């Protein structure tokens, strides 16, 4: 449980889109009891929710409205009866690889779902005090890299020819951790492009309507509560399932792809910390652990936990995947009154305990 001051949410009417998912359930534990009314709007999509039933992890005081953010009629039905003061916009399609073949679905939910929200706010004359959007590190794409002479460049998306030749890195350059105030967003996936469009829509709308907006660009979130059946998101859970079955964990490229893995508890606490600040016209922060970890190292931690075989590099790749991703937390640490508490080893151990409990509960 977060120990930050959440007085700015006490007694407020809060709406959370996509609030029955992984992150939504975690923040409901921190916020639902503090709100005067806490409403979750979620379509319980089968890719995330194997059964279209209320998640056990969703706080009992959360009112669940099963509806799609792209449905204008659903927005009318909800907001004719409920005028939220705080809106946490989590609803999104999040599959990087899947977005290449289902681009329309990602654009519909991530972009049109956001404009349906803003249209409904205007239509019903709601004076929102604060909107918080969870965005993604995917908006940065490959991000900024530094040459040996100190020059900073943006190499852009790795092409198919480069990947087929197993030229994984950009020679003579080092990746720089992303930071919102200095790293240009240049997405290399359809998913990342739709998340950046989502940011742009809300920025333009919120500045015009003088609605305070906070955007959190999340790194790779993992931990108890994430889907164990969705193969498009959450490689930590996917690798855990394989290792638990004593199967070999396959690693793309050369295994040295890096990611910033951040615990769900740290992410939920960051959201609460952001809401606990006096809202500004626009705030933009990176949320991660601040540490880059190779996929190989992460897989080895999981395999060792179960006594599974050594992970194996298979040389496969996915178009649109970035080589390295990590964030610089200096601005977030200085402004949010928050810092990550969970090491990767501790977080992975906690996830394995939860997975065992979930499987026992379902058997």
Swiss-Prot record:
NAD(+) binds at residues 18-24, 68-69, 90-94, 191, 195. GO terms for biological process: O antigen biosynthetic process. It comes from the Bacteria. Transmembrane segments: none annotated. The keyword Transmembrane does not apply. The active site is at residue 191. Pathway: Bacterial outer membrane biogenesis; LPS O-antigen biosynthesis. SUPFAM superfamilies: NAD(P)-binding Rossmann-fold domains (SSF51735). Its cofactor is NAD(+). It catalyses: dTDP-6-deoxy-beta-L-talose = dTDP-beta-L-rhamnose. Its EC number is 5.1.3.25. Keywords: Isomerase, Lipopolysaccharide biosynthesis, NAD. Optimum pH is 7.8-8.4. Substrate binds at residues 136, 191, 220, 259. Gene3D superfamilies: NAD(P)-binding Rossmann-like Domain. One of its GO terms (molecular function) is isomerase activity. Belongs to the NAD(P)-dependent epimerase/dehydratase family. Catalyzes the interconvertion of dTDP-6-deoxy-L-talose and dTDP-L-rhamnose. The equilibrium is strongly toward dTDP-L-rhamnose. This is dTDP-L-rhamnose 4-epimerase. The lineage of its organism: Bacteria, Pseudomonadati, Pseudomonadota, Betaproteobacteria, Burkholderiales.
């Amino acid at each position: 449980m977060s120990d930050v001051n959440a007085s700015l949410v006490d007694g407020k009417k809060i709406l959370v889109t996509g609030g029955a998912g992984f992150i939504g359930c975690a923040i409901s534990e921190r916020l639902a009891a503090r709100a005067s009314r806490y409403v979750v709007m979620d379509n319980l999509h089968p890719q995330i929710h194997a059964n279209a039933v209320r998640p056990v992890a969703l706080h009992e005081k959360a009112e669940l409205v099963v509806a799609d953010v792209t449905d204008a009629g659903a927005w009318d039905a909800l907001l004719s009866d409920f005028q939220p003061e705080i809106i946490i916009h989590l609803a999104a399609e999040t599959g990087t690889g899947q977005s290449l073949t289902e681009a329309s679905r990602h654009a519909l939910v991530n972009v049109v779902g956001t404009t349906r929200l803003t249209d409904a706010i205007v239509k019903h004359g709601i004076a929102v005090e604060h909107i918080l959007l969870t965005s993604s590190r995917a908006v940065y794409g490959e991000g900024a890299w530094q040459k040996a002479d100190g020059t900073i460049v943006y190499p852009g998306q790795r092409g198919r020819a480069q990947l087929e030749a197993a030229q994984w890195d950009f020679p003579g350059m080092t990746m720089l951790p992303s930071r919102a105030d200095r790293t240009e967003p240049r997405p290399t996936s359809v998913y990342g492009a739709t998340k950046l469009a989502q940011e742009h829509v809300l920025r333009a709308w919120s500045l015009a309507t003088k609605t305070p907006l906070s955007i959190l660009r999340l790194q790779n979130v993992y931990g108890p509560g994430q889907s164990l059946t969705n193969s498009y998101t959450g490689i930590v859970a996917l690798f855990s399932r394989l290792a638990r079955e004593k199967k070999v964990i396959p690693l793309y490229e050369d295994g040295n792809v890096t990611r910033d893995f951040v615990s769900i508890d740290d992410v939920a606490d960051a959201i609460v910390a952001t809401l606990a600040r006096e809202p500004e016209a626009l705030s933009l922060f990176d949320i991660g652990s601040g540490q880059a970890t190779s996929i190989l190292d992460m897989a080895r931690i999981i395999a060792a936990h179960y006594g599974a075989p050594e992970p194996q590099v298979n040389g496969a790749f996915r178009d649109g995947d970035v080589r390295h991703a990590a964030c610089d937390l200096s601005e977030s640490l200085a402004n949010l009154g928050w810092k990550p508490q969970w090491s990767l080893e501790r977080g992975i151990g906690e996830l394995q305990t939860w997975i065992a409990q979930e499987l026992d509960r379902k058997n």
